[in-house]
Regions:
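Phosphate/diphosphate ligand-binding glycine-rich loop within oxidoreductases
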Residues: 42, 46-151, 276
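Adenosine-phosphate binding glycine-rich loop
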Residues: 265-266, 271-316
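Glycine-rich phosphate/diphosphate-binding loop of Rossmann-like nucleotide-binding domains
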Residues: 58-70, 152-230
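Positively charged, low-complexity intrinsically disordered leader regions
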Residues: 1-66, 70
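Rossmann-like adenosine-cofactor binding region
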Residues: 204-283
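Short, structured coil segments at secondary-structure junctions
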Residues: 75, 105, 125-126, 182, ...
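Phosphate-coordination loops involved in phosphoryl transfer and adenosine-cofactor binding
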Residues: 48-53, 158-160, 265
Length: 316
């Protein structure tokens, strides 16, 4: 029986987590599970034949590049890869002009850059969907993968508690958006001076008061959590603060005591790359509660579902 799909009638971008609805996420998670199952069974799945993804990197990446590039090829499409060395994004050419040109030659654009404002400007002038591969403010594709990984291992995340330990960065911002949208709670613990910017985290969709709680003690943030997650102490672009951050974050290392305070079946996640002995101890990230390798692989599967959806809509 031939499959049918409902093509997008309006252009849709994925620039932050609030760009999709809870219903759309339910569809994406179900679709990602099916696409992953096909991948594991070596079944071809080529809905994007003759489609081209442009990837623009102003921030270097391993997982983002491999997951998007391999994913697009697995969907039957092709990829154009641009870096700061071979693109003129926002330098010799205005971002608006680059967007108008690139979107006439490709079907989909993924951008990994510094300022959220830059990707917003690009999307406003693009004729094709634009995906946020990471900005200083948000990392929606990673949280998409993290939630999918939780669902794979523990079922629905609705009503659960996620403990965020560390920097109040783009990951923390996006977790807050996701919690408000999908109905779970986030316990956030950061050192003083590195708190989550609540106004930034609110973005377009806002955060609800009952989805967020701040803890000055990271151990208390982990108490009763169903998922404990963290990130590097020093994100890309903040290298000059590295030594200062090592001192400030010394007590924000996820260890066995924090995991013991969480639920007995709590999971540990990290978006990688990880620095063992800094934001997480080796016995945690390499231990039985860690699902970081599934989490990393799932970036590819959820992004395949996302690209398929942005171009083809829902497939029956």
């Amino acid at each position: 029986m031939k499959k049918s799909h409902t093509a997008m009638t309006t252009l849709k971008h994925y620039l932050q987590f609030t760009d999709l609805t809870a219903d759309e996420y339910t569809y994406l998670f179900e679709r990602a599970a099916l696409i992953k199952k096909k991948f594991k069974a070596y079944e071809k799945h080529h809905p994007l034949v003759d489609r081209t993804l442009a990837m623009i990197f102003e921030k270097a990446s391993t997982r983002t590049r491999v997951s998007f590039e391999a994913g697009m090829y697995q969907l039957g499409g092709s990829v154009v890869h641009l870096t700061t060395g071979d693109s003129q994004l926002g330098r010799a050419e205005p971002i608006e002009d680059s967007a108008k040109v690139i979107s006439r030659m490709t079907d989909l654009v993924m951008i990994r850059t510094y300022e959220q404002a830059k990707i917003e400007r690009f999307a406003a002038n693009s004729r094709v969907p634009v995906i946020n591969g990471l900005t200083n403010e948000y990392h929606p594709c990673q949280i998409l993968a993290d939630i999918f990984t939780f669902i794979e291992h523990r079922g629905s995340i609705q009503g659960k508690t996620v403990a965020w330990v560390g920097d109040g960065n783009n990951m923390a911002n996006t977790w807050l958006q996701a919690a408000s949208l999908l109905g779970f709670k986030v316990h956030v613990s950061t050192p003083r001076g590195y708190e989550v910017d609540e106004k930034l985290a609110a973005g377009a969709g806002g955060i609800s008061a009952d989805s967020y709680q701040f803890f000055s003690n990271p151990l208390e943030a982990c108490r009763g959590a169903d998922l404990v997650t963290t990130d590097v102490w020093t994100s890309m672009g903040y290298e000059a603060e590295n030594e200062e951050r090592r001192v400030a974050f010394a007590d924000w290392c996820v260890d066995a005591e924090m995991m013991a305070a969480a639920q007995p079946d709590a999971l540990f996640m990290h978006c990688l790359p990880a620095h063992r002995g800094e934001e997480v101890e080796a016995d945690v990230i390499d231990g039985p509660q860690s699902v970081v390798w599934d989490e990393a692989e799932n970036r590819m599967h959820v992004q395949k579902a996302l690209m398929e959806y942005l171009l083809l809509g829902r497939i029956a």
